[in-house]
């Protein structure tokens, strides 16, 4: 890419209040509203109400109140995996990456088949530049959630950070097969096409334009790379 590697758009969209339709990225990761787990005793109505209150606080951005209520849930239902995952996501939003990873590690240790737990842990590890760990977590998420476009997107971005662009392209295409309107995946696939030697400019342009149509912000580096050189 003309001796320059473009920044990848790894967008983690979380619930916001008052967002107008079409002005926010499609929500990709959100807290789990259900405490119940297969093969375990059903959570009481009282505990579920506390969890619902925590989710409402988290959606409003009151992370401290949400955390207090999530911890109350764990007092009543120790080792509840959905709550551990929610706490991991909450700590991620607070940028407490170490604590987020600790919560998520506990969750996937108790429920190794939790695709959501592996996905969020992979994103947390990615944001700490722990790309090898992120690859392992996201690969596990992809095995557990093969029909999840978000998993393939984040897995592809992480492969791209390692310089494995062919695999990254494959994962972006899988994401788009599952969700053709995934703006971030279109954007990142355009970036990966520009990493080819020679760059696949027309393919990149097609996906970049589609990303813009779907609400992605214009990127001057990508736009310059798609502009034919002046004679």
Which role fits each region the language model picked out?
Residues 59-69, 93-106, 127-140, 162-174, ...:
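Structural signature of tandem alpha-helical TPR/SEL1-like repeats
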Residues 76, 110, 144, 178, ...:
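Structural marker of alpha-solenoid helical repeat scaffolds
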Residues 43-79, 89, 93:
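Alpha-helical segment of the N-proximal tetratricopeptide repeat
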Residues 23-38, 191-231:
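Terminal, low-structured helical/coil segments at or just beyond the last alpha-helical repeat
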Residues 86, 120, 154, 188, ...:
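Canonical tetratricopeptide repeat
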Residues 47, 81-82, 115-116, 149-150, ...:
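Helix-start (N-cap) detector for alpha-helical repeat units in TPR-like alpha-solenoids
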